Swiss-Prot record:
Component of the molecular motor that translocates viral genomic DNA in empty capsid during DNA packaging. Forms a tripartite terminase complex together with TRM1 and TRM2 in the host cytoplasm. Once the complex reaches the host nucleus, it interacts with the capsid portal vertex. This portal forms a ring in which genomic DNA is translocated into the capsid. TRM3 carries an RNase H-like nuclease activity that plays an important role for the cleavage of concatemeric viral DNA into unit length genomes. InterPro entries: DNA_pack_C, DNA_pack_C_sf, DNA_pack_N, HSV_TRM3, P-loop_NTPase. Its EC number is 3.1.-.-. HAMAP family: HSV_TRM3. A motif (Walker A motif) lies at residues 212-219. It comes from Human cytomegalovirus (strain Merlin). Pfam families: DNA_pack_C, DNA_pack_N. This is Tripartite terminase subunit 3. It is found in: Host nucleus. The keyword Transmembrane helix does not apply. Interacts with the terminase subunits TRM1 and TRM2. Interacts with portal protein. GO terms for biological process: chromosome organization. One of its GO terms (molecular function) is hydrolase activity.
Length: 674
């Protein structure tokens, strides 16, 4: 619209004004045509169509003619002019008839309106805006906020879990009527395939605990959560408590820096007395930062979210103040901490592992199932199952483990690996569900319709004890067979010698033979007998017991009898079994099978020494319940034991474990005719 000379001069003048610091950066509006607003008033004109413009535009005749031709003078004649319709259009419009809305359609519209009600709720809009901005931050959308934010971020599972805890609790407290609808939205937003009711109840809890190894971004992740909550949640009150003042001050400055550089243009950000507040015109969102040495600052507050960083190292006096917020129904307390398992004072939150409701989330490089085997291998740095994720910025190798333990013995397991050491040491090996299933579900082995599915071989393990001390040890005998992929217990005996005057070998052999003959007579489909007599205590006595059992059994039945043979010191195969390092392997295999439901008992179980006073299965379950693992020191082989103080011995459970262990085909070659 301007001539070449005028346009050049205006552009030059505009460039000069842009360089001045006193002049605002945005001097040309995109909403209004004020391109000549900076020229002198003598050269300005006000035009109906052009607005404030340079007076030179009046000399541009085509522009003036165009404006005059299409000018709206707001004349009454134009507004009152009668509109003319074509006759065919008028007749077609007259023939149109409208049907009344059906009840089904009206109901569907009401349902649709109810479904979309959530998305029109102002509280939901705040949650949705928070999720949108957080997703933008993860994708690197805030490149101007903080150095490094331009890179895409991938959250660890515990960080995503922490974020869900925060958002879901806020959604439940702010929109209680639409809580279930918000849940569906969160499942979609976080791309969760399935969420059980138990998990939903966990998210609704007023307190949750995260135990995470060091250097995993616990404090780093809290900063954006607080920042975006302040921006989008109107009227929210957040509390942050750290174990040291310099940590709380660091988080305070980082949150303030992020708020001022991200959205200070839209909101007023204020930092006063360790409180960051954002004015939303209608209400203020605040975040208070304190240390455990000044817990009086959090008294009297009305927090919606209270974050306790490094909770294991918070002073116990301050913990009482923090736990007082549990009485407020709109407060969520999140404890986040690393652990040092050398001291109970720095891992006391692990006691929550036995809580009736799940509130403890433990992150470790090693799962609880393989923690002990990991401890035994001095150079291991990864879990054998490789199920756990290790971030790329974490470097763990055998040299790191050796170096840490050189500075302080056990430092690698106590300080670096994670917070499961104290939990796993007291973990029961046999689950309650498997014990109840073993006690209730017993197969009937006399059912003729099931004969074809039962194994034809009976395995018997005998652990002799040559003492009369009932508290020390007794003779354990177990008879086990197969049923498809499961193992059936046919007979159990726990025999104690009356006195040392009688022949111990004869008494033990008679007890075992009596049970074996009874089992064989009840189950005619058994056509082979495999016996293993333990010879660790006395090999000569074990050989004699084997011979006596063979004579007693073969005198009553024509079944084929095989014994487990082991070379003696003269390299002669003898009918006894020497238990060695394979005991630990047998116990671990039994635990796996028992917890998986592969160990079952027969309804017609034979027992002459137990059945008089106890149910043999309940008697066996008492010993199974006592089964525990004993680790002497790091790098040493662990042992298993079922002995507890003032409780019965573990002879019977050892016999059952070894009988099921020897059922494997890999041991078949060791069974021979004696």
């Amino acid at each position: 619209m301007l001539r070449g000379d005028s346009a050049a001069k205006i552009q030059e003048r505009y460039a000069e004004l842009q360089k001045r610091k006193s002049h605002p950066t945005s001097c040309i509006s995109t909403a209004f045509t004020n391109v000549a607003a900076l020229c002198r008033k003598r050269y300005q004109m006000m035009h109906p169509e052009l607005g404030l413009a340079h007076s030179c535009n009046e000399a541009f005749l085509p522009l003036m003619a165009f404006c005059g031709r299409h000018r709206d003078y707001n004349s009454p004649e134009e507004s009152q002019r009668e509109l003319l319709f074509h006759e065919r259009l008028k007749s077609a419009l007259d023939e149109l008839t409208f049907r009344p809305c059906s009840e089904e359609q009206r109901a569907s519209y009401q349902k649709l309106d109810a479904l979309t009600e959530l998305y029109r709720d102002p509280q939901f809009q705040q949650i949705n805006n928070f999720m949108t901005d957080f997703k933008k931050w993860l994708d690197g959308g805030f490149s101007t906020a903080v150095e490094g934010d331009a890179k895409a971020i991938r959250l660890e599972p515990f960080q995503k879990n922490l974020l869900i805890h925060v958002i879901f609790f806020i959604a439940v407290t702010k929109i209680p009527v639409l809580a279930n609808r918000v849940l569906q939205y969160l499942i979609h937003a976080f791309q969760i395939d399935f969420l059980s009711q138990t998990s939903i109840d966990i998210f609704k809890q007023k307190a949750t605990v995260f135990l995470v190894p060091r250097r995993h971004g616990k404090t780093w992740f809290i900063i954006p959560i607080i920042s975006f909550l302040l921006k989008h949640m109107i009227g929210i009150s957040i509390g942050y408590v750290a174990h040291q003042k310099h940590v709380s001050q660091f988080v305070l400055k980082e949150v303030e820096f992020r708020c001022r550089h991200t959205f200070a243009r839209d909101y007023v950000v204020e930092n006063k007395d360790n409180v960051i507040s954002i004015d939303h015109r209608g209400a203020k969102s605040t975040a208070l930062f304190a240390s455990c040495y000044n817990t009086n600052s959090i008294r009297g507050q009305n927090f919606h979210l209270l974050l306790v960083d490094e909770a294991h190292f918070i002073k116990k006096e301050a913990f009482n103040t923090i736990l007082g917020f549990l009485a407020q129904n709109t407060t969520k307390i999140i404890f986040i901490s690393s652990t040092n398992t050398t001291s109970d004072a720095t891992c006391f939150l692990t006691r929550l592992n036995n809580a009736p409701f799940d509130m403890l989330n433990v992150v470790s490089y090693v799962c609880e199932e393989h923690l002990h085997s990991f401890t035994e291998k001095g150079d291991a740095t990864a879990c054998p199952c490789y199920r756990l994720h290790k971030p790329t910025f974490i470097s763990l190798n055998s040299q790191v483990r050796k170096t840490a333990n050189m500075f302080m013995p056990g430092a690698f397991m106590d300080e670096i690996i994670g917070g499961t050491n104290k939990i796993s040491q007291n973990t029961v090996l046999i689950t309650d569900q498997s014990r109840e299933e073993f006690d209730i579900l017993r197969y009937s082995t006399l059912n003729t319709n099931a004969y074809d599915y039962f194994g034809k071989t009976l395995y018997v393990y005998l652990d002799p004890a040559f003492t009369t001390n009932r508290k020390a040890s007794g003779t354990g005998v177990a008879a086990v067979g197969a049923y498809r992929h499961q193992f059936l217990i046919y007979g159990l005996e726990h025999f104690f010698l009356r006195d040392l005057s009688e022949s111990s070998e004869v008494a033990i052999a008679e007890c075992a033979a009596h049970m074996i003959i009874s089992v064989l007579s009840l189950h005619p489909y058994l056509d082979e007998l495999r016996i293993a007599v333990e010879g660790n205590t006395n090999q000569a006595a074990a050989v004699r017991i084997a011979c006596l059992i063979r004579q007693s059994v073969q005198s009553s039945t024509l079944i084929r009898v095989l014994f487990y043979h082991t070379p003696d010191q003269n390299h002669i195969e003898q009918p006894f079994y020497l238990m060695g390092r394979d005991k630990a392997l047998a116990v671990e295999q039994f635990i796996s099978r028992f917890n998986s439901g592969y160990i079952k008992a027969s309804q017609e179980l034979v027992s002459y020494t137990i059945k008089l006073s106890h149910d043999p299965i309940e008697y066996l379950l008492e010993q199974i319940q006592n089964l525990h693992r004993v680790t002497l020191a790091e790098g040493t082989t662990a042992r298993y034991s079922a002995k507890r103080q003032n409780r019965i011995s573990d002879d019977l459970i050892i016999a059952v474990i070894m009988a099921t262990y020897l059922c494997d085909d890999i041991h078949a070659i060791r069974f021979r005719v004696s």
